[in-house]
Amino acid sequence: MQWETVIGLEIHAQLSTRSKIFSGASVAYGAEPNSQACAVDIALPGVLPVLNRQAIEYAIRFGLAIDATINSPSVFARKNYFYPDLPKGYQISQLEHPIVEGGHVAIQTGDQEKTIRLTRAHLEEDAGKSTHEEFHGMTGIDLNRAGTGLLEIVSEPDMRSSAEAVAYAKVLHSLVRWIGICDGNMQEGSFRCDANVSVRPAGSEALGTRCEIKNLNSFRFLERAIDYEVARQIDILESGGSITQETRLYDADRDETRTMRSKEDAHDYRYFPDPDLLPVIIPQEWIDQIREKLPELPKDKRNRYIQDFGLQTYDANILTAARELADYFEQMVSVLPGQSKLCANWIMGEVSARLNKEGLEIARSPISPEQLAGLLLRITDGTISGKIAKDVFDSMWQSNGDSADTIIDAKNLRQISDDSEIEKWVDDVLAANPQQVADYRAGKEKAFNSLVGQVMKTSKGKANPAQVNSVLKKRLTE
């Protein structure tokens, strides 16, 4: 039997506010346990939550970026369950009136583009953290994270493979960073994925029994967990068994999912409106003000790069994967108008390779976009060849801000375009390689490339390649 995979994702994006969503406590990462939990966070009697206005604005910003509806009024509800790191015995979340409803994003897998619908995005507070490593036979509770503002982004079950799920998660990861509402640091838990996975016979419209895989904090783990879970469910069904609706966790060391607890539905949490928080009324004027402040979004910038700069879709997708990368590219193009493809090639090639090797973000590149544009200018005006430019790039990376011109002059790397000197090198190479000359004249084109290489070697890479080609062809046809 052929099976179809059905996947929906719930993504928790930690909002980049300076304080928590219902208290004034700091959200700085890495503080001593329980040093950033105030009376509201630890649920002392008599305290009341006060909603963080910035969290509301961030949620609206996200909703506008995905073409969603902003609900007004928006209502907070209590999600009731008992857990050691949840001091109140309930979590403040949203159920019936989320702040963001609907919306969509486009993903790319291979050559295929697909639209993924979003169900909703709602605000909620994070729980604390249970730790086990330092307490033999006991559990430690750290409430620093309790009350931290989250935007939970829920998709429709529109994904049909782990590749699509990863592509969707990457699009959202890029978007929340792009619009400045989340730092996206997956190692610190700022961006976490829960995957709802089921399978059904190919062609069926009915949804299968789903299992939820919790707290996947890397794209690689997301892909591997989904692949394992799909194979597990198919194996059970083909053996005559049935799938139990449950929550599972992914064990990266064993590369498997394991049962965590039975899966709860909304009624199990006994949601009801929080009596301590009034419904949030969002004026249209405020929404319009936030819309005006939105940066150019990735999809719009991508289309502009294709139309205005003539870039291929693949190149435009890469350059708009992060706002800092797009800014770097645009600053280069402003210095080198008409050379957008050359700028894109160097960013995606030499710059990205070096950044990946050293584990750096583009914002920490030791070569500024203006400096790199200065290097490429020396290629376009014939001062140096592309090969020499790569050597200059390496020197610029390792220097303390030296410009391309400084390094070119210090190392005497300027390209030689003097006809008489190039003719001398060509004549010397032809005299030393009579067999290759004969091969070329006999129709073997590869011999020509070999001769070009030897001329460039003789000139120590300084000869103008275009002139070498021209002089060499002239000599070989004489």
UniProtKB/Swiss-Prot annotation:
Protein name: Aspartyl/glutamyl-tRNA(Asn/Gln) amidotransferase subunit B
One function term, GO molecular function aspect: asparaginyl-tRNA synthase (glutamine-hydrolyzing) activity
Reaction catalysed by this enzyme: L-glutamyl-tRNA(Gln) + L-glutamine + ATP + H2O = L-glutaminyl-tRNA(Gln) + L-glutamate + ADP + phosphate + H(+); L-aspartyl-tRNA(Asn) + L-glutamine + ATP + H2O = L-asparaginyl-tRNA(Asn) + L-glutamate + ADP + phosphate + 2 H(+)
Subunit structure: Heterotrimer of A, B and C subunits.
Any Pfam family the entry gives: GatB_Yqey
EC number, UniProt record: 6.3.5.-
Protein's GO biological process: glutaminyl-tRNAGln biosynthesis via transamidation; translation
SMART domains reported in the protein's UniProt record: GatB_Yqey (SM00845)
Function noted in UniProt: Allows the formation of correctly charged Asn-tRNA(Asn) or Gln-tRNA(Gln) through the transamidation of misacylated Asp-tRNA(Asn) or Glu-tRNA(Gln) in organisms which lack either or both of asparaginyl-tRNA or glutaminyl-tRNA synthetases. The reaction takes place in the presence of glutamine and ATP through an activated phospho-Asp-tRNA(Asn) or phospho-Glu-tRNA(Gln).
Similarity comment text for this entry: Belongs to the GatB/GatE family. GatB subfamily.
Organism phylogeny: Bacteria, Pseudomonadati, Pseudomonadota, Betaproteobacteria, Nitrosomonadales
NCBIfam families: gatB, PRK05477.1-2, PRK05477.1-4, PRK05477.1-5
Keywords, ordered alphabetically: ATP-binding, Ligase, Nucleotide-binding, Protein biosynthesis
Originating species: Nitrosomonas europaea (strain ATCC 19718 / CIP 103999 / KCTC 2705 / NBRC 14298)
